[in-house]
Curated annotation (Swiss-Prot):
There is a cross-link at residues 158, 357 (Glycyl lysine isopeptide (Lys-Gly) (interchain with G-Cter in ubiquitin)). One of its GO terms (cellular component) is GATOR1 complex. In the presence of abundant amino acids, ubiquitinated at Lys-158 and Lys-357 via 'Lys-6'-linked ubiquitination by the WDR24 component of the GATOR2 complex, thereby inhibiting the GATOR1 complex and promoting mTORC1 activation. It comes from the Eukaryota. This is GATOR1 complex protein NPRL2. Disruption phenotype: Embryonic lethality due to defective fetal liver hematopoiesis. Embryos also display reduced methionine levels. Lysosomal acidification is impaired, leading to defective lysosomal processing of cobalamin and methionine synthase. Conditional deletion in skeletal muscle causes constitutive activation of mTORC1 signaling: muscle fibers are significantly larger and show altered fiber-type composition, with more fast-twitch glycolytic and fewer slow-twitch oxidative fibers. Mice with a conditional deletion in muscle also have altered running behavior and enhanced glucose tolerance. One of its GO terms (molecular function) is GTPase activator activity.
Length: 380
C-alpha cells in the first residue's frame, strides 16, 4: 500500500458500563495517548446521531477513522453494546482508500456479534488483538489481508487506491496505449470499448476513431475516458509534420534514467532496423525548438533518423513529457465578424480543435488566416 495512506495504529474502543468510553486494545500498544483519546472520544463512542456512520477526525497531528457501532438489546448493560474498530494515520495522510475497509470491518464485527456474541464475550473478544496485528502488518505491506476469524468465518479485505479523475478526452486528442496493446484482453471491456480498440494506434484522433469504428462520438469519448482512468491509454496531440515541439527540462531524465533509456530506444527504433543509439535520440529531442517543424527536423538530421521512427520519437517524447507541443491559437483583433468559425478565433482554441470542429485541413485553415489582416497567431 502507498505510503500516503499508511496505517500507524489500529484500535478497538468500547463503552464500559462503569468506566465509560475506553480503548480496550490498540496495536501497537500505547500509541494513542490518554490526551489524544480524551480529545476525540466523543467521535469514537458517539451519540446516536453519529452511530453507524463513517467518521474521520484530525487532532494532535493524527487522523482517526472509525465507524461507531451500536447494537441495542436488553441482554447488554444499559441495553446497548457500543464499540468502534478504527485506524490511526498521520494527519496529512490521504485516507479515502481506507474508509471502505473501516466501514466493512464495522459490518463484519456487527454480524459476528449478532451471530455468536463475538464482541461482548470476553474470551472471543481477545482474538481481536492478533486480528488487529495481522490487519496492520498486511494492509501496510500489500494493501490486502485475509483474516481467519473462526472455523466458519474468514474476512477478505483489499485497499482500493483512489485514482485521480482523468483529463477529458476531446475529439482532437489521440489515445496511445501505455503498454503493449497485446497485453490487454478486449473481452474484459464493454462492447463500445471492444469496438474501438482496433482503431487506437497512437495516431488516430478521437473523432477519426469515431468515424472509422462507426461509433457515436460521445460514446467513444466516454470509452476513452474509462481507459484513461485505468491507465490503459494516455492522450497526446495529433501528429503532423508541420507541428512544432520543444524539449522540456525532463529530457535530462533520458541521460540519467537507465530504464527510461531502455524503454525509449525500444519504442523509437524502426521495425527491422539496428537499434537506435541514445546519442542520436537525445540529439534529435534537443534539436526540437520553436520555429522548427518535424519536417525541418527530418531534413536536417537524416543520419540520426536512419534507425529512428520520427513518429514514434515524437509520440514517446509526449507520453513521457520529454517534449511538449507548441500549438497555434488564432486571435481575431477586430470584433466585427462573429460567424462560425470566426467565433473560435479567441486565442482559446487551437488549430487541432478548430480543424476538428470545422472539417478544414491545417493547410486550408492556414490559407484562410494568412489572408485575413484581422487575425494574429499566438503560439503557446
Amino acid at each position: 500500500m502507498g505510503s500516503s495512506c499508511r496505517i500507524e495504529c489500529i484500535f478497538f474502543s468500547e463503552f464500559h458500563p462503569t468506566l465509560g468510553p475506553k480503548i480496550t486494545y490498540q496495536v501497537p500498544e500505547d500509541f494513542i495517548s490518554r490526551e489524544l483519546f480524551d480529545t476525540v472520544q466523543v467521535y469514537i463512542i458517539t451519540k446516536p446521531e453519529l452511530q453507524n456512520k463513517l467518521i474521520t477526525v484530525t487532532a494532535m497531528e493524527k487522523k482517526l477513522i472509525g465507524c461507531p457501532v451500536c447494537i441495542e438489546h436488553k441482554k447488554y448493560s444499559r441495553n446497548a453494546l457500543l464499540f468502534n474498530l478504527g485506524f490511526v494515520c498521520d494527519a496529512q495522510a490521504k485516507t479515502c482508500a481506507l474508509e471502505p475497509i473501516v466501514k466493512k470491518l464495522a459490518g463484519y464485527l456487527t454480524t459476528l456479534e449478532l451471530e455468536s456474541s463475538f464482541v461482548s464475550n470476553e474470551e472471543s473478544k481477545q482474538k481481536l488483538v492478533p486480528i488487529m496485528t495481522i490487519l496492520l502488518e498486511e494492509l501496510n505491506a500489500s494493501g490486502r489481508c485475509t483474516l481467519p476469524i473462526d472455523e466458519s468465518n474468514t474476512i477478505h479485505l483489499k485497499v482500493i487506491e483512489q485514482r485521480p479523475d482523468p483529463p477529458v478526452a476531446q475529439e482532437y486528442d489521440v489515445p496511445v496505449f501505455t503498454k503493449d496493446k497485446e497485453d490487454f484482453f478486449s473481452s474484459q471491456w464493454d462492447l463500445t470499448t471492444q469496438q474501438i480498440l482496433p482503431y487506437i494506434d497512437g495516431f488516430r484522433h478521437v473523432q477519426k476513431i469515431s468515424a472509422e469504428a462507426d461509433v457515436e462520438l460521445n460514446l467513444v469519448r466516454i470509452a476513452i475516458q474509462n481507459l484513461l482512468y485505468y491507465g490503459v491509454v494516455t492522450l497526446v496531440s495529433i501528429l503532423q509534420y508541420s507541428n512544432v515541439y520543444c524539449p522540456t527540462p525532463k529530457v535530462q531524465d533520458l541521460v540519467d534514467d537507465k530504464s527510461l533509456q531502455e524503454a525509449c530506444l525500444s519504442y523509437v527504433t524502426k521495425q527491422g532496423h539496428k537499434r537506435a543509439s541514445l546519442r542520436d535520440v537525445f540529439q534529435l529531442y534537443c534539436s526540437l525548438s520553436p520555429g522548427t517543424t518535424v519536417r525541418d527536423l527530418i531534413g536536417r538530421h537524416p543520419q540520426q533518423l536512419q534507425h529512428v521512427d520520427e513518429r514514434k520519437l515524437i509520440q514517446f517524447g509526449l507520453m513521457k513529457n520529454l517534449i511538449r507541443r507548441l500549438q497555434k491559437y488564432p486571435v481575431r483583433v477586430s470584433r466585427e465578424e462573429r460567424s462560425h468559425p470566426a467565433r473560435l478565433y479567441t486565442g482559446c482554441h487551437s488549430y487541432d480543435e478548430i480543424c476538428c470542429k470545422t472539417g478544414m485541413s491545417y493547410h486550408e485553415l492556414d490559407e484562410r488566416l494568412e489572408n485575413d489582416p484581422n487575425i494574429i497567431i499566438c503560439w503557446k
